[in-house]
């Protein structure tokens, strides 16, 4: 009877499929997680563990999620899961930012701008909830585990009340004041904008040089004659020349500013005498196409107080001094309109200049303003320029392209406009201050010093922003927002003396009824007869205040969480957004940051490094990736990319990610298949009885796990994925598993050589499945179920794998890792010779070869120590080893084996057919099949 020896091999199978089919399998796994209430189970088993709190920066509840949202949520999920596996209680409470103009704008687009305010708020609330539901489903589809049933929403009544209470604390600590200052103003929004709501884009603007005539009397010496010690003929007209890219602001001009320490030249030209900064004189004359002669020079300080005639308004303005003046462009003399610029405002305060804005909120000049009354600001540019040209005050006009602030929502240029607003002061504190004895800026800068940054360059960036930022304008003139619940005296324009008490009473009402409680409130309910002297403030809070105070409204209120958080994680734009607003409110309330560490990730760009935009057609939606390739592919791409810079994505990049995933999946499948008949309880062996290469790989895997825990701890996920991929493809696939196949397939099923291998594979796969779980969450769960655990169990209910006999592993690591590292190097040299022989047609496969190795010294001793097991390491049928005196004599020769091929193990051996009953087998296979089985010590 002919024996089918293939059936005698240990060729096991697994239900873990080769193809992931992730797009189909993942939704079913999500459903199972929800039905088993996995997140709640994680919380239950984590009770009593040390906490790790990653506080979710709330995305805005408007529109579908994009690839940047996916990157952000996946990074957070990787951290939460790795911390859970590390033995922390790491809850994740997702949140949404719900108030603000973008949502209100959507309602206006759909219903028009004339709805009653209460109806607008009602529609905004409903719209925000719809957007949250859509975004939530998309985030969950990415495999992000969290308290999705109880997210925090800034429009929740309790949080709206908490925001008002946070405002009260900042007020009590003396950081809040009302002032009329220039703020970023969006004409389309009809409201002030926060710094974080401003984007800089290129804009073409008129750049003009304008002469302000220095006033002198014809019958007396010109005032500049004494200042500059110059002879100035009677009747000479002298112009102080300014340069500006905003001609429309000239109606608001109140002064011309010079730097007190710069040199200024009086220059005689055919257009009159001009006053210019000395360093810029030649450039200015070239621009004006004029010849000129410098008559005299002086320091800017000497010019202070000179009177100038406004070029078209009926008023006299003064020369003032300011250190914000630069010589980078222009003339060195700065047109100063305190209503339209912060530098102008601050210097104007020093000189008592008015800062009333002639421009209304709709971008039009007040009717009473001469020349441009009722005109839109951008149209006023041409009128101003034509007027200056006609009057002879225009020395030059051109159009330039420069970086200019735009509204982040409307993508339109903004203006700077002085309006009565409420500010959180960076330097000042009110007389009622109960704060920490330092300015808010100093508190914030000290808090930055105490914060850890990932990557490290984030510290300098945030420090620079805090060091240079103006006071924070927190008031807005919109409907859909948390109201600034202040009562203002109608005549004195001061806050009610019982403001802290009133704020708490209003917060109590809002907690029950939402923000509508304030808007519908009759002041007499709280003020009684005093109500006739007070009016309710109708301004709402900047939405950055909403999200910036979640450390008060969420971290301190949710019993799952803790203040301060261990980590805030957002995109790099949040240095001027949520990171900063949270820092400022945290310092204003508690004197410290609400976080101990900040992690910043870059923006997503296409394969060529271009920003994604619908107009370019290079947008890749995360929903499409999940629905076609699977969320685990998206997660693997995120984790594989160094998030500290830009993250590139394209179809080609995703294709490479899929290939990486396949290699990992195939490795896992091999491990699972070869553990199909393994039961740890029955088949466990103490490592001392294992084959040496198995002990080596156990020690190597333990060292790998230790390294990866470090990568996870330092948030270096791309390093972790690179190491894991290399481990699967090179350490396992290219080395260990390649060697192991012979022993797994041909040794006795219950023999020590095979069980030794399976013991090692058991620990390797249990380590790997956990190490991959934070990244490949769906695949890790699929592997976990295949390992035979309970259907109710999950990899996320466990911690990192605990290896057996830790002390023995450590000892093995010190000895076996360097020993086998050298063996792997020598093996690589032999494999190259085998491959060359195969390419040249000398052999068919490595098993058809005899390898002759001449080695010297320690290398000979190392190879010789393996005995006959060396052939299994080299995956060849026969090895002849010979000692030589030195490296010069070392050689590797490959020849074709003259022996017969064993039908079962495919080795070419001299003893094939030595047992008549199994005439096509080698003696090793006969022993494994019908005898006591082979013995392996090393491989």
Curated annotation (Swiss-Prot):
> Per the record, what about its domains?
IleRS has two distinct active sites: one for aminoacylation and one for editing. The misactivated valine is translocated from the active site to the editing site, which sterically excludes the correctly activated isoleucine. The single editing site contains two valyl binding pockets, one specific for each substrate (Val-AMP or Val-tRNA(Ile)).
The entry marks the following residues as binding ATP, namely: 614
Q: How is the cofactor bound?
A: Binds 1 zinc ion per subunit.
Annotated protein name in UniProt: Isoleucine--tRNA ligase
Positions of short motif 'KMSKS' region: 611-615
What positions does the entry give for Zn(2+) binding? Answer: 902, 905, 922, 925
Q: Does the keyword field hold Aminoacyl-tRNA synthetase?
A: yes
Taxonomic lineage is: Bacteria, Pseudomonadati, Pseudomonadota, Betaproteobacteria, Nitrosomonadales
Cofactor field? Zn(2+)
Q: Please list the reactions this protein catalyses.
A: tRNA(Ile) + L-isoleucine + ATP = L-isoleucyl-tRNA(Ile) + AMP + diphosphate
Q: Which residues form the signal peptide?
A: none
Position of sequence motif 'HIGH' region: 59-69
Q: Which UniProt keywords apply?
A: Aminoacyl-tRNA synthetase, ATP-binding, Cytoplasm, Ligase, Metal-binding, Nucleotide-binding, Protein biosynthesis, Zinc
GO BP of this protein: isoleucyl-tRNA aminoacylation
GO annotation, cellular component aspect: cytosol
Q: Please, which domain of life does this record's source organism belong to?
A: Bacteria
Q: Can you state the subunit structure given in the record?
A: Monomer.
């Amino acid at each position: 009877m002919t024996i089918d020896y293939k059936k005698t091999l240990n060729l096991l199978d697994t239900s873990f499929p080769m193809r992931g089919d992730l797009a189909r399998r993942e939704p079913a796994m999500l459903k199972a997680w929800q039905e088993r209430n996995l997140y709640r189970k994680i919380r239950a088993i984590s009770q009593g563990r040390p906490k790790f709190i990653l506080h979710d920066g709330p995305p805005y509840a408007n529109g579908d999620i994009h690839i940047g949202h996916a990157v952000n949520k996946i990074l957070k999920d990787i951290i939460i899961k790795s911390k859970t596996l590390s033995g922390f209680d790491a809850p994740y409470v997702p949140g949404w930012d719900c108030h603000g103009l973008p949502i209100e704008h959507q309602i206006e687009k759909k219903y028009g701008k004339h709805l009653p305010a209460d109806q607008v708020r009602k529609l905004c609330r409903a719209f925000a909830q719809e957007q949250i539901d859509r975004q939530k489903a998309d985030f969950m589809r990415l495999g992000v585990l969290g308290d999705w049933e109880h997210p925090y929403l800034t429009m929740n009544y309790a949080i709206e009340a908490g925001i008002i209470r946070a405002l009260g604390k900042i007020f009590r600590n003396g950081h809040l004041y009302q002032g009329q200052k220039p703020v970023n103003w969006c004409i389309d929004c009809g409201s002030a904008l926060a710094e974080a709501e401003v984007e800089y884009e290129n804009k073409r603007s008129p750049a003009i040089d304008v002469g302000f005539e220095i006033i002198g009397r014809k019958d007396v010496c010109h005032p500049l004659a004494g200042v500059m010690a110059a002879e100035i003929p009677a009747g000479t007209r002298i112009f102080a020349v300014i340069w500006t890219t905003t001609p429309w602001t000239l109606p608001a001009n109140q002064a011309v500013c010079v730097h007190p320490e710069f040199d200024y030249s009086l220059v005689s030209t055919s257009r009159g005498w001009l006053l210019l900064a000395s360093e810029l004189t030649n450039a200015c004359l070239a621009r004006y196409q004029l010849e000129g002669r410098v008559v005299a020079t002086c320091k800017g300080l000497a010019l202070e107080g000179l009177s100038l005639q406004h070029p078209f308004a009926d008023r006299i303005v003064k020369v003032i001094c300011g250190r914000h003046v630069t010589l980078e462009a222009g003339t060195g003399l700065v047109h100063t309109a305190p209503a339209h610029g912060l530098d102008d405002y601050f210097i104007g305060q020093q000189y008592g200049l008015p800062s009333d804005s002639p421009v209304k909120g709709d971008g039009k000049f007040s009717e009473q303003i001469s020349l441009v009354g009722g005109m839109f600001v951008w149209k006023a540019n041409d009128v101003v320029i034509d007027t200056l040209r006609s009057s002879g005050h225009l020395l030059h006009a051109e159009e330039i392209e420069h970086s200019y602030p735009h509204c982040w929502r409307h993508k339109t240029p903004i203006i700077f406009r002085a309006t009565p607003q409420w500010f959180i002061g960076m330097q000042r504190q009110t007389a009622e201050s109960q704060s920490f004895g330092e300015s808010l800026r100093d508190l914030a800068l000290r808090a930055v010093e105490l914060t850890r940054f990932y990557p490290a360059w984030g510290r300098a960036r945030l420090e620079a922003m805090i060091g240079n930022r103006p006071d924070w304008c927190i008031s807005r003139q919109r409907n859909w927002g948390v109201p600034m619940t202040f009562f203002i005296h109608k005549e004195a324009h001061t806050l009610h003396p019982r403001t802290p008490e009133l704020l708490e009473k209003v917060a109590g009402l809002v907690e029950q009824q939402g923000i509508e409680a304030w808007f519908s409130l009759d002041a007499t309910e709280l003020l009684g007869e005093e109500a006739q002297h007070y009016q309710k403030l109708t301004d709402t809070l900047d939405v950055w205040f909403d999200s910036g105070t979640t450390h008060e409204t969420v971290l301190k209120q949710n019993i799952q969480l803790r203040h301060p958080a261990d980590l805030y994680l957002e995109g790099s734009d949040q240095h001027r957004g949520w990171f900063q607003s949270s820092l400022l409110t945290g310092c204003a309330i508690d004197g410290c940051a609400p976080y101990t560490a900040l992690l910043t990730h870059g923006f997503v760009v296409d394969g060529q490094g271009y920003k994604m935009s619908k107009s370019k057609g290079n947008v890749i939606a995360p929903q499409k990736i999940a629905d076609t390739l699977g969320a685990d592919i998206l997660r693997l791409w995120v984790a594989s990319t160094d998030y500290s810079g830009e993250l590139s994505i394209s179809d080609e990049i995703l294709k490479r990610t899929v290939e990486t995933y396949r290699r990992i999946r195939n490795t896992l499948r091999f491990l699972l298949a070869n553990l199909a008949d393994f039961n740890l309880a029955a088949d466990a062996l103490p490592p001392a009885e294992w084959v040496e290469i198995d002990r080596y790989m156990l020690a190597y895997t333990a060292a790998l796990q230790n390294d990866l825990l470090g990568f996870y701890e330092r948030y270096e996920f791309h390093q972790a994925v690179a190491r894991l991929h290399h481990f699967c493809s090179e350490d396992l696939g290219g080395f260990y598993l390649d060697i192991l196949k012979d022993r797994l397939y041909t040794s006795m099923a219950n023999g020590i050589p095979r069980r030794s291998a399976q013991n090692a594979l058991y620990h390797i796969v249990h380590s790997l499945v956990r190490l991959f779980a934070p990244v490949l969450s769906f695949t890790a769960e699929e592997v976990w179920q295949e390992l035979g655990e309970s259907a109710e169990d999950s990899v996320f209910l466990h911690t990192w794998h605990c290896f057996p006999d830790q002390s023995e592993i450590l000892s093995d690591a010190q000895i076996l890792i360097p020993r086998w590292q050298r063996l792997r190097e020598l093996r690589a040299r032999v494999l190259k010779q085998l491959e060359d022989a195969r390419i040249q047609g000398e052999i068919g496969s490595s098993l058809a070869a005899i390898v002759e190795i001449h080695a010297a010294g320690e290398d000979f001793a190392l190879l010789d120590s393996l005995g006959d097991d060396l052939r299994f390491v080299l995956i060849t049928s026969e090895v002849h080893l010979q000692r030589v005196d030195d490296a010069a004599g070392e050689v590797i020769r490959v020849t074709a084996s003259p022996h017969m091929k064993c039908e079962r193990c495919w080795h070419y051996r001299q003893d094939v057919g030595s047992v008549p009953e199994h005439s096509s087998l080698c003696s090793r296979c006969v022993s494994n099949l019908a005898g006591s089985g082979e013995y392996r010590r090393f491989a």
